[in-house]
Amino acid sequence: MPKPDIHPNWYPDAKVICNGEVVMTTGSTQPELHVDVWSGNHPFFTGTQKILDTEGRVDRFMRKYGMGSADAAADEKKPDAKNNNKDNTSKED
């Protein structure tokens, strides 16, 4: 006999939403499911090639921890070759 009141609520008509449109209904423990890709717009099922515009993990990390963008951090790490050559030259006496 299962314990009462420990199981999640079941929504037999949960809406699956992709790009602001309801694309299908299914059963779930959530009343609404928000997805980026589903079988109606996935390149494998549609036979087309599509580049998904999703945020990269590094950019998300940088934004989350307030470090600016990943591109700015990469630019800061690159030393200027002209300045390094001047600083690293030694005078021979």
Curated annotation (Swiss-Prot):
Domain of life: Bacteria
Bias type Basic and acidic residues, positions: 74-93
Cross-referenced InterPro entries: Ribosomal_bL28/bL31-like_sf, Ribosomal_bL31, Ribosomal_bL31_A, Ribosomal_bL31_sf
GO cellular component: ribonucleoprotein complex; ribosome
Record flagged with keyword rRNA-binding: yes
Family matches, as Gene3D superfamilies: Ribosomal protein L31
Keywords on record: Ribonucleoprotein, Ribosomal protein, RNA-binding, rRNA-binding
Quaternary structure and partners: Part of the 50S ribosomal subunit.
NCBIfam families: L31 (TIGR00105), PRK00528.1 (NF001809)
Protein name in UniProt: Large ribosomal subunit protein bL31
Organism: Prochlorococcus marinus (strain MIT 9313)
Gene behind this protein: rpmE
